[in-house]
């Protein structure tokens, strides 16, 4: 019975998040109400409040959904070190995360996310957002860098943690460019990130 309840709860969450993502794009985050989200998801408004607390928390839950793929793939990425050059694999990790992110939230919806985080009076919103978008990706890049250090292909003196999170900040700048510059394509986004990965990681690569 407990398993059935959890399954039903997950199904309701999926319906709520789908409804919210559609309405945020159609009407804008500020003009969408919890009641409208509930009506489209065919649940009660108290259910939405119970699951997410606030509309802002629901928006951040959508962001977190886009980061699930990188967390699940983390062990696999480290194992790929034997078959990829360091720069190529780091770029692949970031590319995978970008694709997962855009599968979960459209470019238009990301515009609402950025605006919400920038204007929220809640001082905890921005740290939560940054931790969500950087945590899984940073951990995946760090694991890959350490795998290459163990293989002698990345300078052992490198602080893998610091470089990994520098790379997440670089990725975020390019991603924001993609959100703002409507003429920019996903392929151009990936190419820009790959160029910077080569510049940043290249000096630390060693012959294994």
Language-model-detected regions and their locations in the chain:
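Hydrophobic/aromatic residues within well-ordered alpha-helical segments
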Residues: 12, 55, 62, 66, ...
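Helix-turn-helix
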Residues: 15, 19-57, 61, 65
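Hydrophobic alpha-helical connector segments
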Residues: 61, 75-107, 160-167, 190-193
């Amino acid at each position: 019975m407990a398993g059935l309840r959890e399954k039903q709860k997950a199904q309701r969450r999926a319906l709520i998040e789908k409804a919210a993502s559609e309405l945020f794009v159609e009407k804008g985050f500020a003009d969408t109400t919890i009641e409208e989200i509930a009506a489209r998801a065919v649940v009660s408004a108290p259910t939405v409040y119970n699951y997410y607390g606030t509309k802002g928390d629901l928006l951040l839950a959508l962001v977190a959904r886009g980061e699930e793929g990188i967390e699940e793939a983390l062990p696999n990425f480290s194992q790929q070190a034997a078959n990829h050059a360091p720069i190529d694999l780091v770029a692949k990790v970031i590319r995978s995360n970008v694709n997962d992110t855009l599968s979960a939230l459209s470019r238009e919806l990301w515009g609402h996310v950025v605006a919400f985080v920038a204007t929220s009076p809640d001082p905890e919103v921005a740290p939560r957002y940054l931790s969500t978008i950087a945590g899984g990706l940073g951990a995946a890049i760090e694991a890959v860098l350490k795998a290459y250090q163990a293989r002698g292909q990345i300078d052992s003196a490198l602080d893998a943690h610091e470089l990994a999170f520098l790379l997440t900040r670089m990725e975020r700048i390019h991603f924001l460019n993609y959100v703002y510059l409507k003429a920019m394509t996903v392929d151009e986004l990936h190419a820009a990130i790959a160029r910077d990965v080569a510049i940043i990681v290249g000096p630390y690569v060693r012959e294994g």
